[in-house]
Amino acid sequence: MRKIVIAGNWKMFKTQAESQEFLKEFLPALEETPQEREVLLCVPFTDLAILSQSLHGSLVQLGAQNVHWAENGAYTGEISGPMLTEIGVRYVIVGHSERRQFFGETDETVNLRLQAAQKYGLTPILCVGETKQQRDSGETESLIVSQLDKDLINVDQTNLVIAYEPIWAIGTGDTCETTEANRVIGLIRSQLKNPDVPIQYGGSVKPNNIDEIMAQPEIDGVLVGGASLEAASFARIVNYQ
């Protein structure tokens, strides 16, 4: 049985004070949310400790946006698995396209981060996807298969979430057609040893398209960027019909 995972990725938004204001409106909106839906907030590092306290006992799990492969060391600006688990973090995004594009993340470093996340008790959300140029060149399938082959070396597929994020649809307002997203996610599933890995769609997910997205049989949830920053918007996504 595949799990439904709805994750908000706040990226580099929200101070601690702003995060608390968000929760005042967001948490009451989850009173009738089905318990079997896993709801996550993947927030900036500075928000993790206070949200760990604020979310205690709620339906919402806490997620980080990156993790280093070493337990500790001279890695300025990085954060380790034990540091995250100590404050109650359960999930961590690994290999987001913005990390790959702006910070030199490679499939090799993504793989190291995935293994480290699992080693220290975190469930990683692995992001894969193609650029518009790659899609227009017909490279979507080969690129994603290559990413999965390299990223998942020695990774436990019983403790894993995958997010398909077509890069050309992130923050652009262009949403991948739901049937096409379903097709690509089916391709991803066909490459896995464990067919029950939850696979999300990410890319301009909004309240007005969430019902159609979640009606697709291969899609097990969403990774939401901008629409997760407003409490009412993200609550509508979490409470999709």
Curated annotation (Swiss-Prot):
Coiled coil: none
Active site: 96 (electrophile), 165 (proton acceptor)
Organism domain of life: Bacteria
Major localisation: cytoplasm
Pfam name, any one: TIM
Catalytic activity, EC: 5.3.1.1
Enzyme class: isomerase
GO cellular component: cytosol
Keywords: Cytoplasm, Gluconeogenesis, Glycolysis, Isomerase
Compartments where found: Cytoplasm
Involved pathway(s): Carbohydrate biosynthesis; gluconeogenesis; Carbohydrate degradation; glycolysis; D-glyceraldehyde 3-phosphate from glycerone phosphate: step 1/1
InterPro entries hit by this protein: Aldolase_TIM (IPR013785), TIM_sf (IPR035990), TrioseP_Isoase_bac/euk (IPR022896), Triosephosphate_isomerase (IPR000652), Triosephosphate_isomerase_AS (IPR020861)
PROSITE patterns found in the cross-reference section: TIM_1, TIM_2
Residues annotated for substrate binding in this entry: 9-11, 171, 204, 225-226
GO molecular function, one term: triose-phosphate isomerase activity
Any GO BP annotation: gluconeogenesis
Catalytic activity annotation: D-glyceraldehyde 3-phosphate = dihydroxyacetone phosphate
NCBIfam families in alphabetical order: tim
Quaternary state and interactors: Homodimer.
Family per record: Belongs to the triosephosphate isomerase family.
Record-given protein name: Triosephosphate isomerase
Organism of origin: Trichormus variabilis (strain ATCC 29413 / PCC 7937)
Gene: tpiA
